[in-house]
């Protein structure tokens, strides 16, 4: 998967996730299938000295029961279910992100941070730290989306092709096209 906008848009996130500095989200280059970097696991991981997605990469929240030590060491594990919904597991919390179209140029974004029962009450002072980086990344993405939308309205805009790293988006386009043709 790609994150080719990450280096220029998300400096705070790239500090925590070194692979994102290269515009990638996986150590496997989707164009060639060749390993990228020196990871034995194809998934991206937090950098040395970081444990989770907070501005300083640290957390005082308890670890979530269930994930393996290998998954916890990554600092983040993504699961995408559709082009508009994904779950992100961190060692100390889970985040869901849902995009719901509201019109041709509007989308509703819902981000939920999930904790095991009782953790929010026992660690109230840590909650802002938990959501701070996520809110920042969402705001940065929102601004870029707004600028992109302005460009799409330009008389000079010409439709292009998707990059090889955008394979999941291509699959979504094909799925949508099949649904529209069948309707």
Predicted regions and their residues:
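C-terminal catalytic domain of Rieske-type non-heme iron oxygenases
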Residues: 1-183
């Amino acid at each position: 998967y790609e994150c080719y906008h990450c280096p220029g848009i998300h400096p705070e996130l790239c500090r925590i996730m070194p692979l994102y500095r290269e515009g990638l989200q996986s150590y496997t280059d989707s164009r060639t299938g060749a390993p990228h970097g020196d990871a034995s696991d194809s998934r991206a991981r937090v950098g040395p000295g970081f444990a989770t997605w907070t501005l300083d990469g640290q957390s005082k929240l308890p670890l979530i029961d269930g994930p393996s030590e290998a998954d916890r060491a990554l600092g983040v594990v993504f699961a995408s279910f559709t082009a508009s919904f994904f779950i992100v597991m961190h060692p100390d919390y889970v985040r869901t992100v849902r995009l719901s179209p509201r019109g041709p140029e509007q989308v509703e974004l819902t981000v939920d941070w999930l904790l095991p029962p009782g953790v929010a009450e026992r660690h109230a002072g840590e909650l802002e730290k938990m959501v701070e980086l996520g809110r920042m990344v969402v705001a940065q993405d929102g601004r870029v989306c707004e600028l992109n939308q302005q460009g799409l309205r330009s008389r000079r805009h010409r439709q292009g092709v998707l990059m090889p790293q955008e394979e999941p988006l291509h699959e979504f386009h094909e799925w949508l096209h099949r649904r529209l043709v069948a309707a």
